[in-house]
Amino acid sequence: MNTVKTVRELRAAVARARSEGKRIGFVPTMGNLHAGHAALVKKAGERADFVVVSIFVNPLQFGPSEDLDTYPRTLAADQERLLEAGCHLLFTPTVEEMYPDGMDGQTRIHVPGVSEGLCGASRPGHFEGVATVVSKLLNMVQPDLALFGEKDFQQLAVIRKLVRDLNLPVQIFGEPTVRAADGLALSSRNGYLDEQQRAAAPAIYRTLRQLGERIRAGAEDFPALLADARQALEQAGLRPDYLEIREPISLRPGVPGDRQLVILAAAYLGSTRLIDNLSVHLD
């Protein structure tokens, strides 16, 4: 595995791989990698011949009161995990490399519709930062395919629309959420949880599953279902940010009669905000 820090080095390495007829796969990350990231890299290796991973904690997607300064930087451990997972090229740019003219003057990309509401309402400017950095990275790497985890479901919807609307020549794959044995979705922010909070955290997925089962059983009073689910989260010690039933492509509110739905949740344990989702297929 080769590690590069500049766009010039990145493009040269990718060009060499492409000249050898290799199909390029790409997995963008913010580091502090866990088994979910490793699964994305391994899947990229199944779909492509040359796997590029980026590690960049993107300031543009953090709000002023969020955890940019405290977000864990664990490069040495990340490199070991990526080597084991089959990464060929690691790109670790600085903020100055990504935003050479500073962030205030950086052209930004807004993806309408799917970026609004849910996490977009709770974290103003977040998806603009995500869309901007992903656009830059896709232009830098120019991969044949890129992989993202379905845990960040709204982010995946934003990226799919971004790629479609801007006619970017890349296939986007969403990969299933990797979970701990008790159902908690793996997340770099799980490390912020203390022992008591970690014990309470699986209630998010448990509540989503119970809600999904009720919908599959024919329940159609979505407001009542959501009220019950919010109460279940609160009783488990979580503070819900949002809990919504949506249509999975447009992310419009789901209605009875929709055959494909996704339930999305965000909740706080102390100051740590966790997100999760569950797809519901009514065939």
Curated annotation (Swiss-Prot):
It is an enzyme of class 6 (ligase). This is Pantothenate synthetase. PANTHER family: CYTIDYLATE KINASE/PANTOATE-BETA-ALANINE LIGASE, PANTOATE--BETA-ALANINE LIGASE. Gene3D superfamilies: HUPs, Pantoate-beta-alanine ligase, C-terminal domain. Its EC number is 6.3.2.1. It catalyses: (R)-pantoate + beta-alanine + ATP = (R)-pantothenate + AMP + diphosphate + H(+). ATP binds at residues 30-37, 149-152, 178, 186-189. The lineage of its organism: Bacteria, Pseudomonadati, Pseudomonadota, Gammaproteobacteria, Pseudomonadales. The reaction proceeds by a bi uni uni bi ping pong mechanism. Keywords: ATP-binding, Cytoplasm, Ligase, Nucleotide-binding, Pantothenate biosynthesis. Belongs to the pantothenate synthetase family. NCBIfam families: panC (TIGR00018). Homodimer. It is found in: Cytoplasm. Beta-alanine binds at Q61. CDD domains: PanC (cd00560). It holds the Pfam family Pantoate_ligase. One of its GO terms (molecular function) is ATP binding. The gene is panC. GO terms for cellular component: cytosol. Pathway: Cofactor biosynthesis; (R)-pantothenate biosynthesis; (R)-pantothenate from (R)-pantoate and beta-alanine: step 1/1. The active site is at H37. GO terms for biological process: pantothenate biosynthetic process. Catalyzes the condensation of pantoate with beta-alanine in an ATP-dependent reaction via a pantoyl-adenylate intermediate. (R)-pantoate binds at Q61, Q155. Transmembrane segments: none annotated.
